[in-house]
UniProtKB/Swiss-Prot annotation:
Main location: nucleus
Alphabetic keyword roster: DNA-directed RNA polymerase, Magnesium, Metal-binding, Nucleotidyltransferase, Nucleus, Transcription, Transferase, Zinc
Name the UniProt record assigns to this protein: DNA-directed RNA polymerase III subunit rpc1
Binding site for Zn(2+) 2: C107, C110, C154
Positions bound to Mg(2+): D491, D493, D495
GO CC list: mitochondrion; RNA polymerase III complex
EC number: 2.7.7.6
Length: 1450
């Protein structure tokens, strides 16, 4: 019989979630039983009590028991709800604020909203507008609330309405009787007689309040009209206000509050919710039994207890609970189960524990490929992959089934087509294998080549989880190639890592393409390579490629086999030295490594300076200029800058960009194998002899320290005598410390240079430092020479004892040794005081790291939450999850930061041209002239194939060829080079074959050549004749003079001939190198177009998440310190994590607000001082020599004298008149202008008023204390102004203003307002608008990253700035800012203030459409990013489609 109807078990996608409030009927309808019994268990039957909070109708938590409602066991029954009917209504603690707001908005007598009819209709129309988003509705509701609060009398019934306030934890009072309205006067008149007999009553009448208990509030809410409810942004059908007050309570299923049996069966441990529900039932029963017979006070007390118990059940952290109502032990309410890191949202919905994962310690294995991970056999036997049986794999899977679960490669389970699952531990496996059919699923062991996700926590960026291919190996650790350490930030000192096994073919495909190591060699932060050679590999590469590294044939061939697989064909290059014995250089190893066979198409071309470069390019004495031509290493030693990470000019980055990531990964694998074997065979170690300084080195070190000590002694002497020249804006102390710090810190750097120059070439620490594998010059200097000055918080060691650092030194000692200078090295060992200072310096680093981890972790979480759902769409816009446009085109050019070859640009034109000219010589083609080059370039750029490119990119190509005001173009370089060699050159606009010689006159080449030849012949004849004449007429003096004269002429002629010969010889060489043909230009432009196309951002890219990680991840490498402003020791500026935190928080108050002000007259220091005086806050206390009281018989007054010298030295534009105006305008002093008299320019007199209440002398004391703080000049919010040099070479100045009020600074005479900037984002927004604030965010973050030596693509910063400003105001990435940016309830609930957002959503009937990242993860829906952005339509056969019936057809 055919099954007509089959139950559809296919999972449905949840379209949206509607939040609302449950009515009494809804609660009863949802429930299966009313709970009335407070007893938990029937002690006789040892079963849950019927109608109790553990009734089996609610489900079961016992493995043996069955649910009496659905008849299922604990595994299948999800549980059922019950309800408790409360005898008296209580406030829902989650809605208490909403209840108070509604009570404030309505009349407390007739329940009408406190608005007139006109406004009511206006706001109703607004609220019914479907286009308004939640943020606008919230803003409108706030406006309505404020308007209602101002209304004191109801416009309908005339009742008085006052303020609604909260009293205690959950009592609401109505201050009805405060105010002076007519109705209140009538109310007070009622008590006139009572006051006569009891006068004390008068003070209490105005304190009278209405107690709005839940019963009163419930009755008021029931009377609110439908229209008024809509105005309050609530739903009149599913969200009426009376539902905010609890009359019925839902009892959750037993499965979420299970009973845990105690050992020995002596009882159970009950959940907090169960006990609280039992307590509510008990109080409820007590109220029911006492409601008719008990006193009102007893009932009210029980009611309060019921309210408290219900509140604690919902939220156990209720503030303001009376002591007697507080639970004796901590209780976890419903809110506590949802919020926090371990709550339901973050702990179980947004992130959860997974199956098919493993974790163990990691260790290195250089013989593995870059994209492989060695999986221990123990893990491979446990983790399985469900492979479906097909015609192609049935034989292999049959073998796995026969091997079973204990033998690798085997299988653990078979899942048949009918859903039956069979374990292969027992039974006849041969039979099972024979019965295997197409379509069955075999859960087999991990085998070589399986795709696995590899992850190390903390996962700070995208590259912290990548996919590798499994390689099953013995032993118990996960192993991988050390080149992949950097993206994971892994080391092998005991780190553990996780592996995950994707369970579907689709997941494997996505993991391979999107997360594969080969496809993620570069970081999306800035396009630099992260997967690269490291440590030992760098040391070995440096040793192999050094000068004078020669290998005989057998050794060279052996080294080639080290990096090659057995089946790889290798062609040895010709030896560098043929006689007396064939020798190959170490540089040739790299040639074979890049291009093992001559058939390989990998022709790598680039040149760069390595770490050891000193001078003379190719002839660098330290072999520091690396030149690769067609994959041959011509010169240079290989070090970190060539094969390490973080450098766009590195070998692997160029291989990846010019060829493919696979070729780069293969070369990296070969290098790892070679270096590991090379160091294993040759050996490389470090020991005590390596760091033992030679006598000469020790002597030079002592000389350096003595010289520095002498300088310090001079500074100390000048400081003590007061003759030290002050730095700009610094005190004597600050200047002295800055100079000492600079001098002593320089010692360590000098010692580092000394070590590099004096240590032998074979010194191991030196080799590691030079090649960049480990350590630096400073580390070497500390080991061998001197540990150096210890710094704590940016300064020398502060005084810990009374006026000294430790008791070992004299009081007020400031010499180097007493303030933390360590002259010994680690080799010689430190004395106790030096060791103590050294620990202080080290401790600061440890504390800084510990604090920084928590700070950056929270910062990155906030960034991720704000940016996670931003992605590029098919129109290249960047939108959020609800379709709001954040950027019209990503990064203003639509390019991917990961595809940037040059600094923020997609093509490195110079290197691309070099590569083209090296690989395509085109010797038979004629060279192109400048006007031809320009014409060809323009025609290709304007053609159809460049249509997809932006104008910006096209202009970059034009600038590369033609140049602009700032840079010389390629054509100009070509011409200037020919001129440099004194060759024929072409003018940029010439169209004819003209040659320009020294005298700039045109000349035909053939004529020049003929003339030269003739002249040479004639000269030869002349020379012969002269020699003959000398022999014949030696005695003749006149003849001798003539001969001498002709000899001089002959030398001049030969020099000219030599110069001309060199010129034509050079021309041939230069023409071959510095020429360009049509084919080369066409190929160059094709390469540029190809690279540009690859660099375009793909639609669906999660640019928001990548941007958040790119900004957050470098934060871990920053510090928490405050640094000095460049060039000004005293001007501190906050950098690092605290500054980024200020920026993304959009903080209104920042730690170091600095306005950089340009001057109209920026070359005159006197003018700068005058303008600084106008800005800097100057008080009367600063400029007055004295403020003293004068008492005479005629009266008393205050005498003020101004310090003329001080005013003149600071160029202050003040006198007694301006000061008197400032004093008179100061609030709080209560002085009138006529009370202040002036005597000349520098004296004032203040007379107290005659009718002063407290007496003249007291008033004078008051003035004397407050007058020094009166601001007489400058901007009140500016603390100080420092004059700094813009450029050290040119005497140009600018002002650094510490403080706020950008507008006032810009308006100050002498300031160039258009060139004045502030680092305060909110002030920029208020003064200059949102666009300036956006640019400030970008420039500030870029400055912070640059100051820490980090590079971050500007597109990431741009996206953050656009997100913070796209709503029309600057919103911080905080819980308040994100709430204004985002609409989704689930997303906001999964971030912070979980229950607040849920309660608010319920009150205002919010709807969550589940389109953002967080919501989709919570609900198990495909995220609409990347491969989830689009849907596929299957192409169907039109002939098989059913015919559609016509509209009016029956």
């Amino acid at each position: 019989m055919i099954e007509l109807l089959k139950e559809d078990d296919a999972p449905k996608k949840i379209g949206h979630i509607q939040f609302g409030l449950l009515s009494e009927d809804d609660i009863v309808r949802l429930s299966h039983v009313q709970i009335v019994n407070r007893e938990l268990f029937d002690l006789v039957k040892r079963k849950p009590t019927p109608y109790g909070v553990l009734d089996n109708k609610l489900g079961t938590s016992d493995k043996q028991a069955m649910c009496t409602t659905c008849g299922l066991s604990i595994v299948d029954c999800v549980g059922h709800f019950g309800y408790i009917k409360l005898q008296l209504p209580v406030f829902h603690i989650g809605y208490l604020k909403n209840i108070m707001n509604i009570l404030q908005m309505i009349c407390k007598s007739c329940s009408t909203i406190l608005l007139n009819e006109e406004k009511k209709q206006y706001y109703l129309r607004k609220m019914r507008n479907k286009k308004m988003d939640n943020l606008q509705r919230k803003s409108l509701l706030k406006k309505i609330f404020l308007e209602c609060r101002k209304t004191k009398e109801c416009l309908k019934c005339g009742s008085t309405n006052g303020m609604i306030k909260k009293s205690g934890a959950f009592k609401i009072i109505h201050e009805k009787y405060k105010g002076k309205t007519e109705s209140l006067q009538d109310y007070y008149a009622l008590y006139d007689d009572a006051i006569k007999y009891n006068p004390e009553m008068k003070s209490h009448i105005k304190k009278a309040q209405d107690d709005l208990n839940p019963l009163v509030a419930l009755n008021l809410f029931k009377k609110i009209s439908y229209q008024d409810i809509e105005i309050m942004n609530m739903d009149p059908v599913i969200g009426r206000p009376e539902r905010l007050i609890l009359t019925y309570m839902l009892v959750p299923p037993v499965s979420i509050r299970p009973s845990v049996p105690m050992d020995g069966g002596s009882g159970t441990n009950e959940d907090d919710l169960t006990m609280k529900l039992s307590e509510i039932l008990h109080i409820n029963e007590h109220i029911r039994s006492n409601v008719d017979r008990a006193e009102m006070s007893a009932i009210m007390e029980d009611w309060d207890y019921l309210q408290a118990s219900c509140a604690i059940y919902i939220n156990s952290d209720v503030p303001g609970l009376p002591l007697q109502m507080k639970p004796t032990k901590a209780v976890r309410g419903l809110s506590q189960r949802l919020k926090g890191k371990t709550g339901r949202f973050r702990g179980n919905l947004s992130g959860k524990r997974v199956d098919f994962s493993g974790r163990t310690v990691i260790s290195p294995d250089p013989n593995l490929n870059i994209d492989e991970v060695a999986v221990p056999q123990l893990i491979a036997l446990t983790m399985t992959y469900p492979e479906r049986v097909t015609d192609y794999n049935i034989e292999r899977l049959q073998k796995y089934v026969i091997n079973g679960p204990d033998r690798h490669p085997g299988a653990n389970y078979i899942i048949y087509a009918d859903g039956v699952k069979k374990w292969l531990k027992f039974g006849n496996r041969e039979k099972f294998a024979a019965e295997l059919k197409i379509g069955d699923i075999v859960e087999r062991h991990i085998i070589d080549g399986d795709i696995m996700l590899f992850n190390r926590q903390p996962s700070l960026h995208k590259l912290s989880i990548m996919s590798h291919k499994a390689r099953v190996m013995p032993w118990r650790t996960l192993r991988f190639n050390e080149c992949v350490c950097t993206p994971y930030n892994a080391d092998f000192d005991g780190d553990e890592m996780n592996i995950h096994l994707p369970q579907t073919e689709e997941a494997r495909a996505e993991a391979t393409i999107l997360m594969g190591v080969t496809n993620n060699l570069i970081t999306p932060r800035n396009g630099e390579p992260l997967v690269a050679a490291t440590q030992d590999f760098l040391t070995a590469s440096y040793l192999i490629s050094r000068r004078d590294a020669f290998y005989e044939r057998y050794r060279f061939a052996l080294m080639c086999t080290h990096f090659a697989d057995a089946n790889e064909h290798i062609d040895l290059p010709p030896p560098a030295i043929l006689k007396p014995v064939e020798l190959w250089t170490g540089k040739q190893i790299f040639e074979v490594l890049l291009r093992p066979s001559v058939k390989s198409h990998v022709l790598c071309n680039f040149e760069t300076r390595s770490r050891t470069y000193s001078k003379n390019l190719y002839m660098c004495p330290k072999d520091g200029y690396v030149y690769f031509r067609n994959s041959e290493l011509m010169c240079g030693s290989i070090d970190k800058s060539i094969i390490g990470g973080g450098n766009k000019n590195s070998l692997f980055h160029i291989l990846m960009r010019d060829f493919s990531p696979t070729i780069a990964a293969n070369c990296m694998t070969r290098l790892a194998k070679l270096c590991a074997r090379f160091l294993g065979d040759q050996g490389f170690s470090i020991g005590i002899p390596d760091i033992k300084p030679a006598e000469d080195l020790d002597r030079k070190k002592r000389e350096i320290i003595e010289t520095a000590y002498k300088k310090c002694a001079v500074f100390l002497k000048d400081y003590e005598s007061g003759s030290l020249q002050l730095s700009s804006g610094c005190s004597m102390e600050q200047t002295f410390e800055a100079k000492m710090n600079q001098t002593l810190s320089q010692i360590r750097d000098d010692c580092g240079k000394l070590c590099v120059n004096d240590l032998p070439n074979y010194n191991s620490p030196l080799i590691m430092g030079l090649c960049g594998s480990k350590g630096s010059n400073i580390n070497i200097a500390q080991m061998i020479c001197c540990v150096g000055q210890q710094i704590v918080n940016g300064t020398r060691i502060p005084n810990g004892f009374t006026n000294r650092t430790t008791p070992h030194f004299k009081h007020f000692a400031k010499n180097p040794k007493s303030k933390g200078f360590v002259s010994n090295s680690f080799y010689t060992g430190m004395i106790p005081t030096e060791f103590f200072f050294h620990t202080m310096g080290g401790r600061e680093g440890l504390v800084d790291t510990a604090v920084k981890t928590a700070e950056t972790g929270y910062m990155q979480r906030r960034l991720m939450k704000a940016l996670e759902d931003l992605s590029t769409h098919y129109d290249y816009t960047v939108r959020d999850s609800i379709g709001g446009i954040v950027q019209f085109i990503y990064g203003d050019d639509g390019l991917d930061p990961a595809g940037m070859e040059a600094k923020d640009r997609p093509v490195d034109f110079l290197r691309a041209m070099m590569s083209v000219k090296s690989t395509r010589q085109c010797r038979n083609e004629p060279e192109m002239k400048p006007f031809e080059i320009r014409k060809l370039v323009e025609s290709i750029i304007d053609s159809s194939k460049f249509e997809a490119c932006t104008d910006l990119f096209k202009n970059e190509i034009r600038v590369f060829f033609n140049g602009n005001e700032k840079t010389k173009g390629y054509i100009q370089e070509l011409i200037s080079l020919r001129k440099q060699f004194k060759l024929s050159s072409f003018d940029l606009n010439d169209n004819e074959d003209e040659i320009i010689i020294e005298d700039n006159s045109p000349m035909d080449i053939s004529t020049t050549t003929t003339t030269t030849t003739t002249t040479t012949t004639n000269n030869a004849v002349k020379i012969t004749n002269i020699t003959t004449d000398i022999e014949m007429n030696e005695s003749n003096k006149e003849e001798n003079d003539k001969i001498e004269k002709e000899r001089i002429e002959k030398e001049k002629e030969s020099k000219r001939l030599k110069l001309l010969g060199e010129r034509f010889a050079n021309e041939h060489v230069v023409n071959q190198i510095h020429r360009i043909t049509k084919t080369q230009i066409e190929l160059f432009l094709d390469i540029c177009l190809d690279k540009y196309s690859r660099a375009r951002i793909e639609p669906g890219t999660a640019v928001g998440a990548i941007g958040a990680q790119s900004i957050g991840e470098p934060g871990t490498q920053m510090t928490l310190k405050t640094f000095h402003f460049a060039g000004v020791a005293s001007m501190n500026v906050t950098l690092g994590v605290p500054r980024i935190k200020e920026i993304i928080n959009a903080a209104k108050n920042i730690s170091t607000p600095i306005i950089t002000a340009s001057l109209n007259c920026d070359y005159d220091i006197r003018s700068a001082r005058i303008v600084a005086g106008r800005i800097e806050k100057t008080t009367l206390g600063h400029v007055a020599t004295h403020i003293k009281e004068v008492v005479k018989r005629a009266g008393c007054y205050l005498s003020i004298k101004i310090d003329k010298n001080f005013v003149d030295s600071l160029q202050l534009e003040i006198n007694s008149k301006t000061i008197s105006q400032s004093i008179a305008s100061t609030k709080g002093l209560k002085l009138k202008p006529e009370q202040i008299t002036t005597n000349g320019d520098y004296k004032l007199r203040i007379v107290p008023p005659a009718n002063i209440r407290e007496g003249s002398l007291y008033y004078l004391q008051f003035l004397k204390n407050n007058l020094p703080a009166v601001i007489v000049k400058g901007i009140p919010t500016v603390n100080r102004v420092v004059i700094s040099k813009v450029d050290e070479k040119q005497e140009r100045y600018q002002l650094l203003v510490e403080g706020y009020d950008l507008r006032a600074v810009m308006a100050t005479p002498g300031i160039k307002g258009t060139h004045t900037t502030s680092n305060h984002i909110m002030e920029c927004e208020n003064t200059l608008g949102i666009e300036t604030a956006r640019n400030t965010i970008m420039s500030e973050i870029d400055m912070i990253m640059t100051s820490h030596g980090m590079s971050i693509d500007i597109r990431h910063v741009m996206l953050l700035a656009d997100l913070m400003s796209f709503k029309g105001e600057i919103l911080g990435i905080t819980r308040f800012g994100i709430a204004k940016m985002k609409e989704s309830v689930l997303m906001l609930a999964s971030f912070e203030k979980t229950t607040d957002h849920l309660f608010d959503a319920a009150v205002h009937h919010r709807q969550d459409d589940i389109v953002g990242v967080s919501e989709c993860i919570i609900m198990g829906v495909v995220i609409p990013l990347g491969t989830g952005l689009f849907k596929l339509l299957r192409k169907s056969n039109k002939n098989n489609l059913p015919k559609k019936s016509l509209l009016l057809q029956d």
